[in-house]
Amino acid sequence: GVSSTALLVSVLRRFGANPRFAVPRRSEDGYGLSSSAIDRALEPGRPDLFIALDCGTNSYEEVAYLRSRGIDVIVVDHHRSKEKHLEDGILINPHVHAAPGDAAWHNLCTVGLVFKLMHGLLKRLRSENNPAAFRIKLRDYLDFAAMGTIADLVPLQGENRILARHGLRMLQQTQRPGLRALMRVAGVKPTQGILPVDISFRLGPRINASGRLADAALSVELLLNEDDGFCNETALQLDAFNRERQDIERQITEEAERLVESHYANDHGIVLYGDNWHPGVVGIVAGRVSRKYNRPCVVLGNEGEMAKGSGRSVDGINLVEVLGTCCEHLSNWGGHPMAVGIALAKEHIDTFRAQFSEAVRRYVGGDIAEQELALSAWLPVEHIRERLMDELESLHPFGQANPEPIFGIHGV
């Protein structure tokens, strides 16, 4: 969402537009295109066009509300549709409009879709001889596209691989003050090359930290701002948020693992709730717990009368399909096969816990298989030469659906 907003706003500004942007605050608005987030976005005045990024596919009532006020709506999103399609507005979503599974753009995340949307806009305006359209080079925004693509853990295949590979090169030579300041505080040295791991574990967590603990708009401002002083100060602030996030995450993870060991070790799908758990970091905790115990996990935090949180899955278990069979007590939910956000009344947690575990059991048809170490190949020792290293280098960038090869060697 952050990289998508930065890319879209940057390009529109080059056309002389001055778009407002608003980022939902998790603590106040929850996830996605909520009514409170919309009201806050409309406070400065009614726009002619409202563009929802990385949310909105399932926001039927919210989009209808915007349309009722005479506002055109474009939804650019890659989350799965749960029941029906949007009846109002324009929806750009490759998972809704029957895209062939092998299409090069099928698994684009939202920033990739925004990149394509801007590509289409430039082509259209160039055909109309718009002078600004000829001055804008979309490759200058590949750094934003790469960051969002890698951080969102979409398969690095097809067009995602192209965006990531060329975007990483652009990121190495970026002159954006915000990105350069962020690299400095994160210890990323562009002169030594930038890898996906630098985004996943250094830059991405700092960009996301403000949204988890405060306001994600701060990260968007960092990416857009041209003032070195502001960018240096903001990068330090994001770094501080990230350190705070790590401390909170560590504490909740320890508590969550104790709960699993004492109460839910035999559940096929794990649902955990903590009254003092920060909703902004429970998704990371869910990922850690699911990896440790090799089963889907939902971790919930306290938000008034509601419990809100995130779920993470393991290979072979589609969380969207699982939740579709046990969602009767969920007031809101949605996401991807491997990651979802949910909300429900606290009184329904125990019932949902039992239903979720049973739904996972039915989905896998019994017990979840233990994960195995998947070797890419067995290699004779004499094949490990500089040429092999060069060939492996050509396979970069490694990431989701393009993992770094693991080789086995006999008789070492």
Question: Language-model segments: what does each one mean?
Answer:
Residues G1-L49, R69-G70, E87, K123-T351, ...:
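Hydrophobic helix-and-loop "lid/oligomerization" segment in the mid-to-C-terminal part
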Residues T5, Y60, V111, F115-M118, ...:
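Hydrophobic, well-ordered secondary-structure segments
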Residues L8, V114, G167, L238, ...:
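Hydrophobic residues within well-ordered alpha-helices
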Residues E28, H97-D102, E382-I384:
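A short acidic, often aromatic-flanked loop/helix-cap motif at beta-alpha or helix-coil junctions
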Residues D39, E43-N107, V111-E128, A132, ...:
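Active-site cavity-forming subdomains of large catalytic enzyme subunits
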Residues M118-H119, K346-R361:
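Two-component system phosphotransfer/interaction surface
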